[in-house]
Structure formats: C-alpha cells, structure tokens
Design a protein with these regions (language model features):
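Ribokinase/PfkB-type carbohydrate-kinase core domain
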Residues: 1-64, 71-80, 90-301, 353-374
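Glycine/serine-rich anion-binding loops at beta->alpha junctions
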Residues: 74-87, 313-321
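A structural signal for well-ordered alpha-helical segments within the folded catalytic domains
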Residues: 79-82, 86, 248, 324, ...
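Alpha-helix C-terminal capping segments
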Residues: 85-94, 328-333
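Conserved post-catalytic alpha-helical subdomain immediately downstream of the catalytic base
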Residues: 284, 307-373
C-alpha cells in the first residue's frame, strides 16, 4: 500500500520532535491469564483457545459445577491511560500522568512508566483486572471499587486547584482523560473542567488536541452515555476533540444517538462513522476494528487495512497502542491517513512483541509491512 511506503519517510522527517501531553485518569494492575484446557504436568498445559470453547465449558456446568484453572502469564500495568501513556513515552513524548496509580505509594507495576514521565500525580489506588486471553479475543474481569474515590474535588486537591490544572493543560499539545466507563465520576470531572478550567485556558493560534476513549460503554445507561457524548462535544470549544472507539462501540454510540443506517448500506462501518462524527460535531472520530482502522475528519473519511496478526503474543492494550500512534501522528501534523497508519503500526508491533515500539522501531515496522515481512 502506497501510504504505508510513504509513512516511514514522513516519520523520518519528524525525528527529534518535542511534544508535551497530559494523560489520565485511570490505573489498573492487570493479570494476563490463560485458562487451562488440559494439563500435561506441573509445567506444561494446553490453553482454551477460543472464547467459544470457554463459553461451552461454562455452559456445560449449568446445574452442576466445574473447575477451570487460570494461569497468570504476566502481571503488568493496565488501564487505558497508563497503557496509552506508556506507548507515548516509548515514542519520546514529554508526558505528565494523572490518575489511579496508588496512594500513598505508587504501585510497583507502574514504576517503569512513572520513571520516564515528566511528572506524576497519583490520586487514588488502582483498580484490578483479570484479562482472560484467547486466540480470538479477550474477556476482561474488572474490580473497580477503588476508583469510586476519584472525584473532581480530589483532582483539584491533588493538582493545585483549577488554576494548576489549567496551567498543565495549557502547556500541552494533547490532553486526554481516558476510561469513562470504569470511572463513575468521570462525567462530573469533565463538567468541572468545562466550568472551572476552560475560563482559565489561554487563547492559542491553533487549538490543542483532546483525546477521549470511553472503554466499552455497554455497561452504562443510555442516559449516562448521552451525557458523556454531550460533554465530549463541549470540549470542542477549546480543543480539536478526538473520540476513539472500537467497532462494537461505534455501533452502540450510534444507537444511543438515534442514528439508523440502512440495511442496504454497502459500507455500514463507513456510514456509521460518518454519521456519528457529524452528530457529535467534533474534530475527529477514529474507529479501530480488529483488522482495519478508519477515521472521519471534517468532511472526509480515511481508511486503511491493518497488519493483522493471527497469533498475537499479547492483545490486552492493543487498542491503547493504536490510539497512541494515532494521537502522535495527529500531534506531529501528519495527514489523517498517515496518522491511522501509524496507529496500525504501533498496535501491529505491540501484539507481535508484547511491548510498545520506539520511534525507530515503528519506522522499521512500517518498512517491513510495506515489504510484506509482517
């Protein structure tokens, strides 16, 4: 694909960039888990390969009982904000993180990230996540009670009041408050920023970027989702606002917004993305299905195939890595097609290597992708 070939050259021109970003607001300790199908000995087992097989195992136990062994493969930092930030830090962004990393001490799992960050404000304890990984997807089992203490008042107290928050936000090229679904007070926090921080922000020649990721809103009510969409739209007053969704989420948001796409549509995804983008009135809507990436900006729609990986080493965090690459691309003033392609490269590298790429590694991955080596 020509745009993949062109991406590596464009990235080489951007080497040595200097960008500041402020990201929050969640934090999770993730355990990556493989459910056991058959165990051969105390060291060796075969995993349950698909979600369907896992579901069958559970269904067969109805009215009876069963025992499924779970093997922890890795314990790692989790949450949309930390994984997004970790990827941006690998790229060389000067980043401040605000969120649920542990109090009074930051949990050790976050230390590799916080040691690279320009500044860190930890406001409460992290949530806990068990991520059951399969070859065709993952099941996320979350424990979120600690996140209920993260309120607008707590944010102000921990960050120097509205004035302190305004100073941090005003210095950034990109600002993001992620994981609305799992943070029960996030809408109130956004409202607080709109009411108390917006009046303090300096005027700029070009509005900075603001990135939002809902993180699977299905578990929230339609009224909550509509309120969140309205608040995200208001950020357009001071920012070029980006909403990132997966394919499932964009159809859910369309339903909540009362958008209906004709059954005769030849490209339901494109029509849905364009309609939701228009309804929200924001700068950009970006959507990442499993094998592709697309976005709507202005009156244009952009699409690319991705470097699909049939047997990934790690999938939890792939979407956040894609978001990181896309946000970096826009912050570097790449064209939208190049930005979604950088997102695909970032995610593609991550699922193959179980870690986020450096800037040079992303360039090399784009070259390998263009050469058919991935």
């Amino acid at each position: 694909m020509q745009h993949v070939k062109e991406l590596s050259a464009k990235l080489k021109e951007k080497k040595g960039f200097a960008l500041k970003m402020l990201i929050g607001l969640d934090g999770f300790v993730d355990e990556i888990i493989h459910p056991v199908d058959k165990r051969q000995d105390y060291k060796t087992f075969t995993r349950i390969k698909t979600i369907g097989e896992f579901g069958e195992r559970i269904t067969k136990a109805a009215g009876l009982s069963t025992n499924i062994e779970m093997v922890t493969i890795q314990t790692k930092l989790g949450g949309n904000g930390p994984i997004l930030s970790n990827a941006l830090l690998e790229y060389g962004v000067k980043l401040t993180y605000v969120g649920a990393l542990g109090t009074p001490d930051i949990h050790p799992v976050f230390h590799p990230m916080t040691e690279k960050a320009a500044a860190v404000y930890s406001l409460c304890n992290p949530g806990l996540t068990d991520a059951y990984e399969f070859e065709d997807g993952k099941l996320i089992m979350g424990k979120h009670s600690s996140l209920s203490s993260l309120t607008w008042e707590v944010c102000k107290k921990g960050m120097g009041g509205a004035e302190g928050i305004a100073k941090m936000v005003g210095e950034c090229h990109l600002f993001g408050m992620e994981n609305w679904t799992m943070l029960p007070h996030m809408s109130d926090i956004w409202q607080g920023i709109i009411d108390e921080v917006f009046p303090l922000l300096p005027a700029t020649a070009e509005k900075p970027l603001a990135f939002f990721d809902l993180a699977d809103p299905e578990k929230r009510t339609k009224e909550d989702i509509r309120r969140a969409m309205g608040l995200i739209g208001k950020f357009e007053q001071k920012f070029r606002t980006i909403l990132g969704l997966n394919e499932k989420e964009v159809y859910e948001i369309a339903e909540v917004l009362g958008i209906t796409i004709s059954d005769s549509s030849t490209d339901k995804l494109k029509d849905t993305v364009v309609a939701v983008h228009k309804a929200m009135g924001i700068y950009c809507l970006m959507v990442h299905p499993v094998r592709t990436v697309c976005c709507a900006i202005g009156d244009e729609y952009f699409f690319t195939e991705g470097p699909y990986c049939a047997k990934p080493k790690l999938t939890t965090g792939a979407g956040d890595n894609l978001n990181a690459g896309f946000c970096l691309g826009l912050a570097l003033n790449l064209d939208p097609l190049s930005a979604i392609t950088l997102g695909a490269c970032t995610s593609g590298y991550y699922v193959r290597n179980a870690k986020s790429p450096t800037f040079d590694q992303a360039i090399a991955f784009a070259e390998d992708w263009d050469a058919g080596k991935v």
